[in-house]
Amino acid sequence: MNQKQYRLITNKIREYKYGVRLARFINRFLTEIVYVAFFALLIFMVIQKDKNIVRVVVVTGISFVLVSVVRHFINAKRPYTMYDFVPIIEKDKEGDSMPSRHVFSAFVIAMAFLYVNTYLGVFFLIIALLMAIERVIVGVHFPKDVIVGAIIGVVSGVIGFYII
């Protein structure tokens, strides 16, 4: 997306009476539902004495650290810093845009759910996709940032849960 497209989208959101409030709510809701559900999954696995909890924690934890290190070295600028506009979500970071850690996390957590329960996994893959779209619309990521985050999340999940 280019400067004109980002400004058009963010201005349209601002035009609606509750546009900004709704966009911020959706961002917070999608983020919190993923993390709260993941925590609930871990608690459930502990209660069930499910030995797969070790794999779930290790795969998600190691891949999260690796993505964090990679994005720090890439240090890609965010759309609002490159195109000089105010994003819908308040952010003050100039870099660390690629890959999107929110989207990566949502997808690797969705893969953890898929590993444990197919239906919940599909549900959280849909939530992760919605989060990816939302992160672009509110102006904090480029499409490539969320696509790469999603791919890394899915690949990490496939390798960690199904190949190794």
Describe the role of every protein-language-model region.
Residues 47, 75-80, 139-144:
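Transmembrane helix-loop junctions in multipass membrane proteins, especially transporters and channels
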Residues 64-68, 72, 154-161:
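Transmembrane alpha-helical segments of multi-pass membrane transport proteins and ion-pumping complexes
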Residues 84-164:
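Membrane-embedded catalytic cores of phosphoryl/pyrophosphoryl-handling enzymes
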Residues 40-66:
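Interfacial segments of alpha-helical transmembrane regions
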Residues 1-36, 51, 67-95:
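N-terminal transmembrane-helix/juxtamembrane module of multi-pass inner/ER membrane proteins
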Residues 18, 43-49, 116, 161-163:
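Structural signal for the C-terminal ends of transmembrane alpha-helices
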